[in-house]
């Protein structure tokens, strides 16, 4: 069994071990993807993130 989550009405994550939420929708995995040092596709992911401007270096500085 793996930890799963679904979003409630307020948009908050609700963690569960079940595969379906109370509304019958499938839950999402709460675990991140595995890391591999032999990642063959990292260059492509970075290119896509640059293209759509979602890299952390392309975000505005947070206001402190």
From Swiss-Prot:
Pfam families: Nop10p. SUPFAM superfamilies: Nop10-like SnoRNP (SSF144210). Keywords: Cataract, Deafness, Disease variant, Dyskeratosis congenita, Nucleus, Ribonucleoprotein, Ribosome biogenesis, rRNA processing. GO terms for cellular component: box H/ACA scaRNP complex; box H/ACA snoRNP complex; box H/ACA telomerase RNP complex; nuclear body; nucleoplasm; sno(s)RNA-containing ribonucleoprotein complex; telomerase holoenzyme complex. GO terms for biological process: pseudouridine synthesis; rRNA pseudouridine synthesis; snRNA pseudouridine synthesis; telomerase RNA localization to Cajal body; telomere maintenance via telomerase. Required for ribosome biogenesis and telomere maintenance. Part of the H/ACA small nucleolar ribonucleoprotein (H/ACA snoRNP) complex, which catalyzes pseudouridylation of rRNA. This involves the isomerization of uridine such that the ribose is subsequently attached to C5, instead of the normal N1. Each rRNA can contain up to 100 pseudouridine ('psi') residues, which may serve to stabilize the conformation of rRNAs. May also be required for correct processing or intranuclear trafficking of TERC, the RNA component of the telomerase reverse transcriptase (TERT) holoenzyme. It is linked to Dyskeratosis congenita, autosomal recessive, 1: A rare multisystem disorder caused by defective telomere maintenance. It is characterized by progressive bone marrow failure, and the clinical triad of reticulated skin hyperpigmentation, nail dystrophy, and mucosal leukoplakia. Common but variable features include premature graying, aplastic anemia, low platelets, osteoporosis, pulmonary fibrosis, and liver fibrosis among others. Early mortality is often associated with bone marrow failure, infections, fatal pulmonary complications, or malignancy. Cataracts, hearing impairment, nephrotic syndrome, and enterocolitis 2: An autosomal recessive disorder characterized by infantile onset of steroid-resistant nephrotic syndrome, cataracts, sensorineural deafness, and enterocolitis. It results in death in early childhood. This is H/ACA ribonucleoprotein complex subunit 3. The lineage of its organism: Eukaryota, Metazoa, Chordata, Craniata, Vertebrata. The gene is NOP10.
